[in-house]
């Protein structure tokens, strides 16, 4: 698998675009179009991928778990029906309560088997309740969905235990990941079979409880834990007034001060960039000249703003490496980036302790704790160009 900083900017490109990690509520899906013009909505695809859902949560029986598969095909908002076909999102789908009911019930017992056609989107699971997706008109007058935003207290889905995985399935293959970029709630595992047999996202025994306990006990982080329902990512916590907007400022300032007097080297697929802070901008020379303003704590946590990563092959990959270095707090200790030894991550007092906690919760140490977590391949991401099946498991908690 090609490392994140050596791919065209990754999670938003190959998996899903919902406004990046900083989706606001109500979140209207704006998934990136894929080359699927030959796939009419509603067709039963001969190359549909077998999708198996396994409820091993140990806390909820199958009757208490509901599935929602929503996303995009050829730029159009779609959802998977229980019959395995894609249906376009329509404003008329809203019921008397103002929301759609796109739930797919699990089998009465055992595994639930579905067929996944070419599309890009999310697989949501809701435990003990139903999710409320609202069909609305987007800026062009087309039907779109407002997605759950479990980190927003006023969201109608705030009280529902839920989580999701992300994927793109097209002629090139299956590209998928579990995600904790926005929050961590339900432990999910993905197994992708095909040319290889790969599993990612598996939370270790007791890992969920340990992550909740760790974050709850950290100064400045405790308010991110919502009962036993979810941990909100600190970027969303910042927007909600639950996390210090200047939390990382001392570390950011020290990075800026340090690299006023020495070089930082960043290696990407384009080559090696050498940078110094000049006039309060971190300017890199190399295959191209790129520069960045001093980021805020919010910019770092969302990997956006001053660290926005355009899909240009130069600025974007350097921004991704910087974003990962800030979140993992490796920029001062390692003047050559990216850092590839996980034992060097999160070793300072000021770091993304949320990302550290969710990585520690997984069996293989991989997680999507922030948007650039796939730099140096530490994200819970897998892909296969010849897939034969995808298995999503709600693991025990």
Each model region followed by its residue ranges:
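N-terminal secretory signal peptides
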Residues: 1-9, 20-29, 33-36
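N-terminal export leaders
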Residues: 10-15
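Extracellular low-complexity, O-glycosylation-prone Ser/Thr/Pro/Gly-rich "stalks"
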Residues: 40-397
């Amino acid at each position: 698998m090609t490392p994140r900083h050596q791919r065209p900017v990754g999670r938003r490109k190959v998996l899903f675009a919902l406004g990046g990690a900083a989706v606001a509520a109500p979140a209207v899906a704006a998934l990136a179009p894929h080359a699927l013009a030959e796939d009419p909505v509603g067709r039963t695809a001969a190359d549909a991928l077998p999708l198996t859902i396994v409820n091993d949560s140990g806390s909820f029986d199958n009757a208490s778990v509901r599935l929602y598969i929503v996303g995009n095909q050829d730029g159009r908002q779609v959802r998977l029906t229980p019959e395995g076909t894609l249906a376009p999102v329509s404003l008329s789908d809203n019921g008397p309560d103002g929301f759609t009911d796109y739930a797919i019930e699990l089998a009465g017992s055992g595994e639930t088997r579905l067929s996944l056609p070419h599309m890009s989107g999310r697989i949501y699971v809701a435990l003990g309740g139903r999710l409320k997706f609202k069909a609305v008109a987007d800026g062009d007058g087309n039907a779109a969905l407002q997605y759950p935003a479990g980190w927003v207290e006023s969201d109608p889905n705030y009280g529902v235990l839920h989580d999701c995985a992300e994927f793109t399935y097209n002629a090139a293959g299956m590209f998928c990941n579990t995600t904790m970029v926005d929050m961590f709630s339900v432990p999910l595992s993905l197994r992708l079979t095909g040319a290889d047999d790969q599993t990612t996202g598996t939370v270790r025994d007791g890992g969920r409880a340990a992550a909740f306990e760790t974050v709850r006990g950290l100064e400045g982080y405790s308010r991110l834990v919502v009962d036993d329902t979810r941990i909100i990512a600190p970027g969303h916590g910042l927007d909600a007034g639950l996390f210090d907007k200047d939390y990382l400022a001392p570390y950011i300032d020290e990075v800026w001060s340090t690299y006023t007097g020495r070089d930082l080297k960043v290696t990407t697929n384009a080559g090696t960039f050498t940078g110094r802070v000049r006039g309060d901008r971190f300017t890199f020379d190399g295959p191209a000249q790129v520069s960045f303003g001093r980021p805020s704590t919010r910019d770092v946590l969302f990997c956006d703003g001053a660290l926005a990563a355009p899909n240009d092959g130069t600025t974007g990959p350097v921004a991704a490496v910087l974003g990962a270095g800030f979140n993992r707090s490796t920029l001062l200790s390692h003047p050559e980036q990216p850092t590839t030894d996980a034992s060097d991550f999160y070793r300072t007092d000021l770091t993304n302790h949320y990302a550290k906690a969710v990585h520690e919760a997984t069996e293989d140490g991989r997680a999507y704790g922030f948007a650039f977590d796939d730099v140096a391949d530490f994200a819970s991401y897998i892909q296969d160009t010849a897939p034969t099946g995808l298995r999503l498991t709600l693991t025990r908690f």
